[in-house]
């Protein structure tokens, strides 16, 4: 059975409105006991609600058993986030850092299709040079890794539609758990 990621996305989708316009996901943490299926009940709750940021947690429940969580930390529009200059990671330097290889890029059309499918009305995910949604990156990387039980992602700068994303894989402990870094 494949992980039913759509349930997590729909649960997070209940948090919408003008407050979320131009907000960025800065961190995602996913963990599961077992894969959530379409029969699970998905809920979302706010763990922390601040003036500049918010932490949300989507949960997958099978009966009375919590089977998975997806935590998302949002940074609301402010001076610390690069909104207006439209500089992505690859515009900061030529080529990937040493040891990184190409993973993939997302076209503006793919970004728009994801936004339509999930009901994402954030203006940064629209237009000719949209920012790739963090949840699209999460969903794609989760599939690429073979649906690991845990995945932690930190976003240091926006990635725009059409920009190549580069990753590096590392073994991080004696259990051969993998860590991926991307730029």
Where are each of the predicted segments found?
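Residues in well-ordered beta-strands of folded domains
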Residues: 73, 115, 154
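A conserved acidic, glycine/proline-rich C-terminal tail/linker
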Residues: 145-164
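Hot-dog-fold acyl-thioester-processing enzymes
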Residues: 1-34, 79-150
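HotDog/MaoC-like acyl-thioester-processing domains
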Residues: 2-6, 23-100, 159-183
């Amino acid at each position: 059975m494949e992980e039913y990621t759509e349930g997590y996305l729909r649960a997070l989708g209940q948090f919408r409105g003008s407050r979320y316009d131009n907000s960025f996901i800065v961190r995602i943490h996913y963990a599961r006991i077992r894969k959530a299926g379409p029969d699970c009940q998905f809920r979302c709750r706010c763990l922390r609600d601040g003036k500049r940021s918010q932490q949300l947690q989507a949960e997958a429940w099978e009966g009375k058993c919590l089977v998975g969580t997806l935590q998302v930390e949002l940074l609301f529009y402010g001076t610390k986030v690069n909104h207006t200059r439209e500089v992505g990671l690859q515009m900061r330097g030529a080529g990937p850092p040493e040891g990184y290889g190409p993973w993939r890029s997302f076209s503006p059309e793919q970004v728009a299709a994801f936004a339509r499918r999930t009901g994402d009305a954030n203006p940064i995910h629209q237009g000719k040079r949209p920012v790739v949604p963090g949840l699209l990156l999460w969903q794609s990387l989760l599939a690429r890794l073979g649906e690991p039980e845990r995945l932690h992602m930190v976003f240091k700068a926006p990635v725009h539609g059409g920009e190549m994303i580069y990753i590096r894989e590392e073994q991080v402990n004696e259990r051969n758990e993998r860590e991926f870094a991307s730029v």
